[in-house]
């Protein structure tokens, strides 16, 4: 600043000091007395959900209701498979109602509310069948905890012990790999610049998990389900099962993949070739980093998503889930409200195909915009969902009608056979 602007600077610094003093005083007042006005306004806006609405087709039912109340009316042993993504404690609120599972003070209060739902899920699930629960550990930000750095709340582990408390047998966890670059663009907790300043404060990305719980069958001598989930050997071969179970990958013997081999290709092609190469060769960390650095040197390393993420060879770690393949894509196309935590279609489809038979009933107590029943219909099953948020429930209806029309639409050969 120029010497002639000295008084301006002095005035600015004085005002800035007054501002900081005012902020400090207001912060102390809020800490001591709370935000009474906001709390009162919130209480006036919040209400107890007391209505119920149901729509159905030949292959599905969708109910706008509190899932605890709805499950209490369902028959015992009436559901073949449960696939759901439970709320991540009080991380989000989906409705301004007291019934909302996200409207809780902490994890303890959240699981107290779950204590009313989980026993009902155990009761309505058929013996020997599964409840597949999608969860994710929560990031606790330093400005909220006072630690000054992000830490992780082991929500998935709490969920395991909660379901076991009500008789579910825990027997597996599927890891769904997430894109650490996309995650950082949302949370800013894994920034490269901050890591260079002090790497000791940096953790890792948070994967998602599908927790597998089973209700014991009536007879435990061989532990077959009362109605087993069978596979036709002509459609599901021994060879396929061995590969699925053991992830046995053979190397083709190709030479080391170099960026020079594909520098003219687009990022989609580069990503495809890299993943194929990784699956066929023994993993080498230094080669992985070197390849990514070559991409960066040529200006082809994206900053909005991870182009050369680690590839898994294990069947219980799913690294090929398409993050954008959710019903939110259709929501955006139709200019509707997006779901806060959309469940990927890939995850649901795999669970339904693996753990249910065609024609069976798949239930989602946290139905959202209808992902689970939508996938169930498309895979030859029946779908059932409950959802508290009216807008989400209403949006789900169009997808369920659409799915039923697609699978029920007669083909030309059907019409010809009817004519004959």
Q: Which residues are covered by each model-predicted region?
A:
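Short amphipathic alpha-helical interaction/hinge segments
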Residues: 20-24, 87-90, 94, 404, ...
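Amphipathic alpha-helical surface "interface" segments used
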Residues: 31-38, 230-239, 417-420
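S-adenosyl-L-methionine
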Residues: 48-70, 398-420
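Short, hinge-like loop/turn segments at secondary-structure boundaries
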Residues: 13-16, 150-151, 189-191, 401-404
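Short, flexible loop/turn segments with low-complexity composition
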Residues: 24-33, 223-228, 407-416
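A conserved SF2-helicase RecA2
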Residues: 1-47
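Core catalytic lobe of class I
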Residues: 57-395
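Short alpha-helix adjacent to the SAM-binding motif of class I
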Residues: 11, 391-402
């Amino acid at each position: 600043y120029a010497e002639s602007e000295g008084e301006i600077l002095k005035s600015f610094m004085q005002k800035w000091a007054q501002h900081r003093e005012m902020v400090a005083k207001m912060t102390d007042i809020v800490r001591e007395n709370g935000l009474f006005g906001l709390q009162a306004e919130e209480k006036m806006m919040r209400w107890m959900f007391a209505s119920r609405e149901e729509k159905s087709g030949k292959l599905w039912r969708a109910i706008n209701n509190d899932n605890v109340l709805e499950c209490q009316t369902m028959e015992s042993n009436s559901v073949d498979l449960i696939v759901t993504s439970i709320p991540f404690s009080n991380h989000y609120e989906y409705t301004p109602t007291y019934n909302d599972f996200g409207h809780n003070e902490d994890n303890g209060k959240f699981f107290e509310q779950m204590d009313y739902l989980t026993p009902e899920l155990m009761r309505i699930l058929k013996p020997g069948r599964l409840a597949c629960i999608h969860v994710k550990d929560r990031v606790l930000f330093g400005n909220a905890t006072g630690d000054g750095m992000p830490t992780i709340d082991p929500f998935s582990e709490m969920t395991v012990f909660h379901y076991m408390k009500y008789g579910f047998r825990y027997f597996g966890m599927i890891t769904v790999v997430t894109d650490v670059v996309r995650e950082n663009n949302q949370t800013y907790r894994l920034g490269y610049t901050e890591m260079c300043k002090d790497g000791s404060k940096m953790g890792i990305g948070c994967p998602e998990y599908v927790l597998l719980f089973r209700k014991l069958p009536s007879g435990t001598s061989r532990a077959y389900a009362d109605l087993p989930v069978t596979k036709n050997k002509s459609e599901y071969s021994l060879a396929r099962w061995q590969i699925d179970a053991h992830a046995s990958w053979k190397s083709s013997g190709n030479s080391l993949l170099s960026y020079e081999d594909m520098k003219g290709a687009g990022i989609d092609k580069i990503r495809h070739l890299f993943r194929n190469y990784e699956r066929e060769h023994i993993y080498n960390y230094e080669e992985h980093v070197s390849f990514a650095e070559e991409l960066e040197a040529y200006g082809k390393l994206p900053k909005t998503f991870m182009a050369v993420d680690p590839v898994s060879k294990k069947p219980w770690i799913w690294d090929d889930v398409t993050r954008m393949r959710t019903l939110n894509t259709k929501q955006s196309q139709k200019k509707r409200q997006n779901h806060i935590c959309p469940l990927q279609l890939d995850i649901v489809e795999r669970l339904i195909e693996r753990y249910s038979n065609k024609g069976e009933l798949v239930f989602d107590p946290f139905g959202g915009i209808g992902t689970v029943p939508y996938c169930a219909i498309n895979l030859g099953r029946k779908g059932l969902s409950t959802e508290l948020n009216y807008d989400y429930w209403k949006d789900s209806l169009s997808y369920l009608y659409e799915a039923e029309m697609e699978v029920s639409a007669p083909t030309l050969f059907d019409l010809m056979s009817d004519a004959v």
